[in-house]
Amino acid sequence: MADVRTHAHQVQVHPLRQHEGGIKVVYPQSGPSSTQVLAVVAGVPVGGTLLTLAGLTLAVSVIGLILAFPLFLIFSPVIVPAAFVIGLAMTGFMASGAIGLTGLSSMSWVLNHIRRVRERIPDELDEAKQRLADMAEYAGQRTKDAGQTIEDKAHDVRESKTYDVRDRDTKGHTASGGDRDTKTTREVRVATT
């Protein structure tokens, strides 16, 4: 038969919360504060005055345009080319200003670039000086080592010549006498030093 098992069920209990959002947050239950009341009292007359002035300005502009239209119509052969010339002049001035601003920003960029390069050059110069000093020290050490090697070889050659002279004199010493050998060795030593 079918195996019947009972599974434990989990139950989550959430307490009921009251929603505190929406319009209650914007308008608290206590009513407007005194600063809000003062802002409305001061803002309504100022806003009304500005709105009235805007309406008057629009009305005067429309009336002026209606009155000036016949004059525009009569003088249009002169006004249209004049407006065209003024438009071209304004375009030229704006283009000139834009080109001048571009030139000024380009010059600023070049000067900043030169300033950065000049700040970097002393560091590179110091590095180059340090490398030259290291190379000079290395060359000096190599020269000193080469000089020491040459001096050692010269000393070895002197020693070998001294021994050769002794060997020759020793052969001659047996033939002629012992006094001559010491003189020759001394003379060779003095001559080499």
Curated annotation (Swiss-Prot):
Name of one Pfam family that matches:
Oleosin
Highest taxon of source: Eukaryota
Q: Which family does it belong to?
A: Belongs to the oleosin family.
Q: What is this protein called?
A: Oleosin S1-2
Q: Kindly give the membrane topology term recorded for this protein.
A: Multi-pass membrane protein
- What is this protein's function per UniProt? May have a structural role to stabilize the lipid body during desiccation of the seed by preventing coalescence of the oil. Probably interacts with both lipid and phospholipid moieties of lipid bodies. May also provide recognition signals for specific lipase anchorage in lipolysis during seedling growth.
Give the main localization category.
other
What are the boundaries of the signal sequence? none
Where is the stretch described as Hydrophobic?
Answer: 40-113
